[in-house]
A protein has these predicted regions:
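C-terminal binding/interaction regions
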Residues: 1-34, 39-41, 59, 92-96, ...
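A short catalytic or substrate-binding loop motif that flags glycine-/basic-rich loops and adjacent residues
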Residues: 33, 45-49
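Short, thiol/selenol-centered motifs that function as redox-active sites or metal-ligating centers
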Residues: 47, 72-80
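Short beta-strand elements
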Residues: 50-60
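A short interface-forming secondary-structure element
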Residues: 57, 68-75
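Short small-residue beta-strand/loop micro-motif enriched in glycine and branched aliphatics
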Residues: 63-68, 79
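Alpha-helical support elements that line or immediately flank enzyme active sites
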Residues: 77-92
Length: 178
């Protein structure tokens, strides 16, 4: 579909759990929900592009994710991770969303192939970037952003993500302060 583009078709499905394949075959939250007010993008492009974008409609008063959607490019694992994390996000407060872990996503998919484990980190970093994007759209400063969505640029998840909208937003905010 236009929302999911698999670039690694030669990989087949070896190593993918039946649960993950079922999620990919039956995802319901592809695309950007109408009226989205937050979005994020994470991914890599070295040795093949794998990326995901998350979109959310968030309620300002309750700081809750009402609806979530995604677009992916790459492999089945990134599509499964994006779909599952969108399902987890719906109805969550921002604090609950930020508490979603790689283990939660891995468990929900009954695992991902060992060589695709980075896609779980992409999903979690995309959630963090989604919350960060919403806060910045609401006028949060860099200091306020760091208080809610701290970033360690030397952490493994951050280094895995060659492209990260949250990192780009931070750079823009730092440049504006300079």
């Amino acid at each position: 579909t236009a929302d999911v583009y698999q670039t690694e078709i030669e990989d087949g499905v070896t190593g993918y759990s039946d649960t993950l394949l079922s999620v990919v075959a039956n995802f319901r939250n592809g695309g950007a929900p109408e009226g989205f007010n937050a979005q994020s993008m994470v991914g890599k492009s070295k040795r093949g592009e794998v990326a995901l974008r998350l979109f959310a409609v968030s309620d300002h008063d309750t700081r809750t994710c009402v609806r979530a959607g995604f677009k992916t490019r790459g492999c089945l694992a990134v599509t499964g991770c994006a779909s599952v994390v969108c399902s987890m996000l719906e109805g969550c407060t921002f604090d609950e969303a930020l508490a979603i872990t790689t283990d939660d996503v891995k468990t929900a998919l009954d695992g991902v192939p060992v060589d695709k484990v980075y896609t779980i980190h992409f999903a979690i970093e995309a959630v963090r970037a989604l919350i960060g994007d919403y806060l910045v759209r609401q006028g949060a400063s860099l200091e306020e952003l760091d208080a809610v969505v701290p970033c360690n640029s030397l952490s493994v998840p951050c280094m895995i993500c060659e492209h990260c909208s949250l990192r780009s937003t931070r750079v823009e905010l730092k440049m504006a302060e300079a």
